[in-house]
Regions:
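Cleavable N-terminal export/targeting peptides
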Residues: 1-24
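Gram-negative and organellar
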Residues: 22-408
């Protein structure tokens, strides 16, 4: 809670310091009240216990725009009452605050952000659809980044700066971390549609369990072959050295293509990234993913397949292979009444356990605008797990939620 208050206070101070300038300012308080029924509140595979969860969520959204400062803040205070006392009543927070200061126009910039939210303990598996608390932890990430933009020539753009990232977890075995990052990005415009790119990043991370230093170097191109359609690719290497003297040398890449048609947009991306892992230092993820979006007169349809390999970076051991796809549809029945449906199928292969887990998620919703900025929504979520050998990965959960929300 102290971190949330500090972030909100810093945001307000920055705004107050610039209120004298011509600026746009909006503040919208809100209040949401919801009731949830779940038939497996503890996500047990043998002892299924149901519960009713009442949530009261006052919040506020602030937007500020001025010549040298922009900022957005969204905060929700979340009180949760469990009617059958299967879990202690709790207070949760959701904060997203971002600000950008421009002390010297087109040259010197300062970005700052704070993200406080509840996240999954498992970096390979998002559990937010299944429960409000099982296998989850509260995380706060504070980021501050001063950077410069240089234009040595009309065709060349250089961006260099420093990024400070502090990651904290609360009431958990998760590992706190602090990152100091220096970076240099270069783009050279060969023509209006074709550019060469090069990126270098140095990261120094300190944590309770171990520290490491990492260099990343990438080079490639970006080509816009038609209006809003483009292709990009970068390849390079990452050199990681732990203070415990272990050294790793990994090929990395980042590539993708986006094709825009009249009502259809197709995107495919692939790359290697280092994910924040609550239970470890970092997790290396090699991935291929795509999405096809079809815009309808009153809604949209999308299909998004994906494949990822998660490697325990320090030991260089493959932990999980994940295959999955999501089909999503959204439709506006009237100007005030809309609905949505998502179906996700995933398979998690876990070589270290000699088994796999299959997961299916069905997420459906209806929303009706009762009056101006007053809405009523219904949400039903079904989650089903199956594993031939992992006993705890055989369970299913039904969640039904009704919510009324007023924005002022």
């Amino acid at each position: 809670m102290a971190n949330v208050l500090r972030a909100s206070g810093l945001f307000i101070v920055l705004l107050a310091a610039n209120m004298a300038q011509a600026a746009e300012f909006e503040a919208h308080p809100s209040l949401a009240v919801s009731e949830e029924f779940t038939d497996n509140v503890l996500e047990s595979n043998t002892n299924r216990i149901s519960d009713y969860i009442t949530r009261v969520q006052p919040g506020i959204a602030i937007t500020y725009k001025a010549p040298i400062l922009t900022g957005d803040l969204s905060y929700v205070f979340d009180y949760r009452n469990y009617a059958k006392n299967n879990h202690d009543d709790e207070i949760a927070h959701a904060l997203s605050a971002k600000a950008e200061l421009i002390p010297v126009k087109d040259f010197l910039f300062l970005e700052a952000s704070d993200e406080y939210q509840r996240v999954s303990l498992d970096a390979t598996r998002d559990t937010s659809k299944e429960s409000l608390f099982v296998n989850q932890v509260d995380r706060n990430i504070v980021t501050a980044s001063p950077y410069f933009i240089f234009r040595p020539t009309l065709r060349m753009r250089l961006k260099t700066g420093y990024r400070f990232i502090d990651t904290r977890y609360f009431k958990s075995i998760a590992i706190d971390k602090t990152n100091h990052i220096g970076y240099l990005d270069m783009a050279y415009e060969v023509s209006k549609r074709f550019s060469l790119t090069a990126d270098y990043t140095f990261t120094r991370e300190t944590a309770d369990v171990d520290n490491y230093s990492q260099h990343q170097a990438l080079g490639g191109f970006r080509y816009e072959y038609s209006d809003k359609s483009f292709l990009f690719a970068q390849a390079g290497n990452a050199w990681t050295r732990y203070d415990s003297r272990q050294r790793l040398n990994n090929l990395i890449w980042n590539a993708g293509i986006t094709q825009v048609f009249n009502t259809v947009t197709c995107t495919v991306i692939t790359g290697v990234k280092y994910d924040e892992d609550p239970l470890r230092i970092i997790m290396q993820e090699s991935f291929v993913s795509g999405i096809i979006v079809k815009n309808l007169t009153r809604g949209s349809l999308s299909f998004s397949p994906g494949y990822s390999e998660y490697v325990l970076t320090k030991s260089n051991i493959l932990q999980t292979k994940k295959y999955g796809a999501t089909v999503h549809g959204q439709y506006d029945f009237t100007a005030d009444f809309s609905g949505g449906l998502s179906v996700t199928g995933e398979k998690f292969e876990q070589p270290l356990l000699g088994s796999y887990t299959r997961r299916v998620i069905v997420d459906s919703s209806l929303s009706y605008l009762l009056a101006r900025q007053l809405s009523l929504s219904l949400n039903y979520i079904y989650v089903d797990y199956y594993s031939p050998k992992i006993v705890t990965d055989n369970r299913h959960i039904n969640r039904a939620i009704i919510e009324i929300k007023k924005t002022f």
